[in-house]
């Protein structure tokens, strides 16, 4: 990584120049993975992140420019869907609490969706009261030995890495005895059991940890400060899910309007409901745009 700092005196010009380079790269390379890797290297993965971490250290509102440009070019952003828990929740938390080695190791393959991530929070006996969790991590000198169970783990069966919160000190108040880890889901002792839904699919999973060894360099944040890291991840989850700014008239309202046109419908009741739905989505879109500039 170069030590040369990018000139951000005119961030919009900078972002547009990077976008031009990215779109030009696509003309000679149709690999999605290579494209997303190039997007990361250009700082267009999360523009507000520091340089070298997939960002340009500019206002997050310019991510809207990036996303809108890619949509108009017909370029896939499915990596954000396939790896929502990593890209939306894990990445900003690792940038805030992680070491440089962790940032360098995890963020790029996370963004390219080569390594899927999951969140390991809920347990059979602790859902809404997260701090009452019982999964234990015991320091054995050169690492931690983890035993316990998690449940409702989205994409756990597809994940390479997990964001895991455990109890490392049972003798202090419950919110102070937690530590956060990045766990390799392919480690010996990790067992993932899919939970079949009525549809036959298995998006959620039970995950069992039996004497799983996690190296100390995989602690995220400070030992005993897992509650703070957990709150950061939950905040990032809300931003990732609720803050996705769509194009005007996209998504379900756009599809319904097109269906209305294709079938030449003329029902005033349905028309009113369509207009109401469109207005609601537009209000959310504009609110998210405003929030991105704060």
What positions do the PLM features span?
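Amphipathic, small/basic residue-rich leader segments at the start of a protein or domain
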Residues: 1-84, 95, 101-105, 109-112, ...
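Glycine-rich beta->alpha junctions and the first turn(s) of the following alpha-helix
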Residues: 6, 190-290, 294
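Short Ser/Thr-interspersed hydrophobic loop/turn segments at strand-loop and sheet-helix junctions
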Residues: 43, 66-74, 165-166, 182-188, ...
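Glycine-rich phosphate/pyrophosphate-binding beta-alpha loops
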Residues: 87, 151-156, 198-199
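A short, Trp-centered hydrophobic/proline-enriched beta-strand micro-motif
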Residues: 113-121, 165
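Active-site-adjacent elements of ketosynthase-type condensing enzymes
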Residues: 124-133
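A structural signal for short hydrophobic beta-strand segments in well-ordered beta-sheet cores
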Residues: 135-138
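A short core secondary-structure module
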Residues: 143, 147-193
């Amino acid at each position: 990584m170069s030590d040369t700092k990018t000139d951000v005196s005119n961030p919009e010009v900078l972002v547009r120049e990077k976008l031009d380079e990215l779109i030009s790269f696509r003309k000679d390379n149709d690999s999605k993975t290579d494209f997303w890797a190039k997007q990361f290297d250009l700082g267009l993965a999360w523009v507000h992140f520091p340089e070298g971490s997939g960002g340009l250290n500019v206002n997050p509102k310019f991510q809207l420019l990036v996303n809108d440009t890619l949509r108009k070019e017909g370029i896939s952003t499915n990596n954000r869907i396939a790896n929502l828990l990593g890209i939306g929740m894990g990445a900003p938390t690792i940038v805030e609490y992680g070491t440089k080695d962790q940032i360098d190791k995890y963020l790029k393959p996370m963004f390219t969706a080569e390594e899927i991530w999951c969140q390991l929070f809920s347990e059979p006996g602790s859902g809404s009261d997260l701090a009452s969790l019982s999964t234990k991590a015991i320091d054995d000198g050169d690492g931690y030995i983890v035993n316990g169970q998690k449940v409702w783990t989205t994409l756990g069966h597809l994940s390479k890495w997990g964001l895991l919160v455990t109890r490392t000190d049972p003798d202090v108040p419950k919110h102070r005895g937690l530590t956060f880890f990045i766990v390799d889901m392919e480690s010996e002792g990790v067992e993932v059991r899919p939970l079949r839904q009525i549809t036959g699919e298995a998006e959620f999973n039970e995950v069992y940890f039996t004497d799983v060894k996690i190296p100390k360099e995989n602690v995220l944040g400070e030992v005993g400060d897992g509650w703070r890291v957990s709150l950061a991840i939950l905040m990032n989850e809300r931003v990732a899910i609720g803050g996705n700014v769509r194009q005007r008239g996209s998504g379900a309202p756009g599809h319904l309007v097109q269906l209305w046109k294709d079938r030449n419908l003329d029902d005033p009741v349905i028309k009113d409901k369509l207009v109401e739905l469109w207005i609601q989505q537009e209000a959310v879109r504009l609110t998210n745009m405003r929030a991105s500039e704060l």
